[in-house]
Regions:
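Terminal low-complexity tails and localization/encapsulation signals of metabolic enzymes
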Residues: 1-63, 96, 100, 148-166, ...
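A structural signal for short, well-ordered beta-strand elements
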Residues: 51, 65, 87-88, 277, ...
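Residue-level signal for inorganic ion chemistry
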Residues: 58, 79, 90, 94, ...
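Glycine-rich loop-to-alpha-helix module at the N-terminal edge of alpha/beta enzyme cores
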Residues: 59-149
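Structural signal for hydrophobic packing residues in well-ordered secondary-structure cores
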Residues: 83, 87, 102-109, 113, ...
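Rossmann-like NAD(P) dinucleotide-binding subdomain of oxidoreductase/dehydrogenase enzymes
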Residues: 148-283, 407
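ALDH superfamily catalytic-core signature
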Residues: 247-387, 407-415
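Short, solvent-exposed loop/beta-turn-alpha elements that line the ligand-binding surface or hinge
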Residues: 393
Length: 415
């Protein structure tokens, strides 16, 4: 073998992050989790269960109990009872609790990162270097705002009991976005994690007790869409904060109509990435990589629609194809991996079927490598030769699929 050939064949060696500490923690909890209600972990022997699986291996991580209506009622009542005293604690008192949570999350950041990757399938580099540090910073940040409340935000009032429902693409980060500001302003919480990714929420629930959060201030329930809908419609809730699909958001809006609840809905998207003929194409390609192939494309604001001026479309497409061939698709715990698994077999099948059905309406597909159905690995994908009416241009795919179309003028791109 020549020296040149050796360099051409160079590749990353496998560099797996150890998951022993995370597995030991799951074992210490008998791989089963119930609900956190009024400061206590509640389990029911004959509860209906959800299997939380590692999407890259189908390994069982834990059994998750689905909350029943009585447990939901108890969680809401506990939050209602705890709210007045939590509000009266004042901004400085609440800031102490938020700082305590932030420090504990920071202390356990490594195990949280591994649990997030095991449960979600995202690369450990993203969990370790982006998601978890950002989640921690949200608690530090809002602790600072809590300290300023009485002086700078005295005209603002707490809402009361807030129902919070999050998706599976950024489990702990979404939790922090919801919980930290609500706590800072004196609200109490009934939180529901996504049924696919509840593990880090359960770890956080244990940290709540360790941090000394008063009973009832943070209640956490598990379950599927049925219990989520019941939580959103509950008359004892003053506000619903939901992040997820557009269809579920529409359903929540209907169920809460006429109740006088405050409502925050962060729903799906189909963001456009526009490249003009005078752009730096190499820089544009790197922007595209971060925009659509970050987190396997499972991002509501992913730049999944590429609009490129016709004069440079061919050149840009070639550069994209060369670049995505360099992306590493593989084991999520490998520190050399760029794209991990899609979150579940259901999501893998959904993306695969959407792409196949979409191609029936035309378009050319390029994939950097073969599809690995066993590990739910869907390769970085580029689809070209489509127009604005194409289903893959109109519908959110929520996977590592970039759909490209051309334009001639700026006004045409905007339209």
């Amino acid at each position: 073998m020549t020296l040149l050939k050796s360099f051409e064949d160079l590749d990353y060696s496998e560099a797996l992050e150890s998951n022993k500490e995370a597995q030991d923690w799951l074992e210490s909890n008998n791989r089963r989790f119930g609900q956190l209600i009024n400061g206590k972990f509640v389990t029911v022997k004959n509860a209906k269960l959800i299997e939380s699986l590692n999407p890259s291996t189908s390994e069982l991580l834990a059994h998750i109990e689905i909350a029943n209506s009585e447990q939901l009622e108890s969680a809401v009542k506990s939050a209602r009872k705890a709210q007045p005293s939590w509000e009266k604690l004042g901004g400085h008192g609440r800031a102490k609790a938020l700082y305590a949570l932030a420090r504990l999350m920071q202390k356990h950041a490594r195990i949280i990162s591994v649990l997030e990757t095991l449960d979600n399938g995202k690369p450990i580099r993203e969990s370790r270097d982006i998601d978890i540090p950002l989640a921690i910073r949200h608690f530090y940040h809002h602790a600072g705002w809590a300290q300023l409340q009485e002086k700078d935000f005295s005209s603002y009032q707490s809402i009361g009991v807030v129902a919070q429902i999050v998706p599976w693409n950024f489990p702990l980060l979404m939790l922090s976005w919801k919980i930290a500001p609500a706590l800072a302003m004196g609200n109490t919480i009934v939180f529901k994690a996504a049924e696919q990714t509840p593990i880090t929420a359960m770890f956080f629930a244990q940290l709540c007790n360790e941090a000394g959060i008063p009973p009832g201030v943070i209640n956490m329930i598990n379950g599927d869409g049925v219990i989520g809908a019941e939580l959103a419609a509950h008359k004892g809730v003053d506000k619903v904060a939901f992040t997820g699909s557009t269809a579920v958001g529409q359903s929540i809006r209907k169920s809460t109509a006429g109740q006088g609840k405050k409502l925050t809905l962060e729903l799906g998207g189909k963001s456009a990435f526009i490249v003009f003929e005078d752009a730096d194409l190499d820089a544009a390609v790197e922007g595209l990589v971060d925009s659509i192939w970050f987190n396997q494309g499972e991002v509501c604001c992913a730049g999944s629609r590429l609009l490129v001026q016709a004069e440079v479309a061919k050149e840009l497409h070639l550069k994209i194809k060369r670049r995505i061939k360099q992306l590493r698709l593989g084991k999520p715990l490998d520190k050399s991996t760029d794209l991990g698994s899609l979150v579940s077999k259901t999501q893998f099948n959904r993306v695969s079927e959407m792409v196949q059905e979409g191609l029936n309406h035309g378009g050319e597909i390029y994939q950097a490598c073969d599809i690995d159905e066993k590990g739910n690995y869907y390769p970085p994908t580029l689809i070209t030769d489509v127009d604005s009416s194409h289903p893959l241009v109109q519908e959110e795919i929520f996977g590592p699929v970039l759909v490209s179309m051309t334009f001639r003028t700026q006004s045409e791109a905007v339209e």
